[in-house]
C-alpha cells in the first residue's frame, strides 16, 4: 500500500488579470499550503475502484468523474483500490479536489512504479492540480500552469481556516466578476523576513473573487470578520473562490486559541488551525 497527503491549498492573493478566447481566466496568485488535508491510499487490485471515508465523505459521493479516478486514468490503465479519507470541505476554495487528484498521482506513481507527470501535463484535470502536484509555495500564473518558485523561503507562520458550511461553485463567482483585466502583483515579489512583513504585503494585494463570492454567499463576509476579530490575526481573507477564509497568525498558540474560539461560537462551521507550508 502507498499513501499521499493532500494538503489544503491557500491563495494568499488571487488577481484575475484577463480572460482567454476559450473562456479560461488568467490569474496571478501567491499560493501556499496548510498542514491539514485529505489522505489518499492506493493498494494493488485488478480493477480501478474508489472508496471515500472520513468526516466529509457524506458530501462527496463516489462518481465516475471524481478527480481521483480521473487522475488515475491519466497516469495509466492499471488497477488499484483507492481510498480517499476526506477531511476538507467540498467546493470550498482550498483545492480539496485538486489536492486529492495530485495525491492520487503521487500514491499511484509509487504503487505502479511509474514517473510522475509534469505539473503542466495535468492541467486538464483542473487549474489547481499543477500547483497541488508541486506542493510548495509558488507564484501561480497563466491559467494555473505557470509556477514560479519564490526567491526566498516564506517565514514560519500559522493559518486558521474557517468555512461556514456553504458550498460555492466556482463558475458563478467568475461570471459575477465586475472586471476581468485587473492589475497583477508586482513583477518582483519582495522577501518577507517575518510573518508581519508578509501580512503587510498581502494587505496591499487582493483576492478579486472575494466581492462576487460574498455577493453570492454573504456568510463569507461573516466568516472573514470572525477571523479578523481574533487576537493575533494579522490578515483575514477568502481563499480561492470561497467559501473558506483564512486568518494569518505569527504564533501557533494564538492560532489554536482563535480556532477554538471560533469553533465554540460557530459550532456548525468547519474550523482548523494549521501550520503554513512554504
From Swiss-Prot:
Q: Which InterPro entries does this UniProt record tie to the protein?
A: GHMP_kinase_C_dom, GHMP_kinase_C_sf, GHMP_kinase_N_dom, IspE, Ribosomal_Su5_D2-typ_SF, Ribsml_uS5_D2-typ_fold_subgr
Arranged from A to Z, the UniProt key words for this protein are: ATP-binding, Isoprene biosynthesis, Kinase, Nucleotide-binding, Transferase
Pathway(s) where this gene product acts: Isoprenoid biosynthesis; isopentenyl diphosphate biosynthesis via DXP pathway; isopentenyl diphosphate from 1-deoxy-D-xylulose 5-phosphate: step 3/6
Q: Which domain of life is it from?
A: Bacteria
Work out whether the entry's keyword set contains Signal: no
Q: What class of enzyme is it?
A: transferase
Which BP terms from GO are recorded?
isopentenyl diphosphate biosynthetic process, methylerythritol 4-phosphate pathway; terpenoid biosynthetic process
What catalytic reaction does the record list?
Answer: 4-CDP-2-C-methyl-D-erythritol + ATP = 4-CDP-2-C-methyl-D-erythritol 2-phosphate + ADP + H(+)
Q: What is its EC number?
A: 2.7.1.148
Record's keyword annotation contains Transferase:
yes
Q: What GO annotations for molecular function exist for this entry?
A: 4-(cytidine 5'-diphospho)-2-C-methyl-D-erythritol kinase activity; ATP binding
Give residues annotated as binding ATP: 89-99
Q: State one Pfam family annotation.
A: GHMP_kinases_C
Residues of the active site? 9, 128
Family, according to the entry, reads as follows: Belongs to the GHMP kinase family. IspE subfamily.
What this protein is reported to do is described as: Catalyzes the phosphorylation of the position 2 hydroxy group of 4-diphosphocytidyl-2C-methyl-D-erythritol.
Name of the molecule in the record: 4-diphosphocytidyl-2-C-methyl-D-erythritol kinase
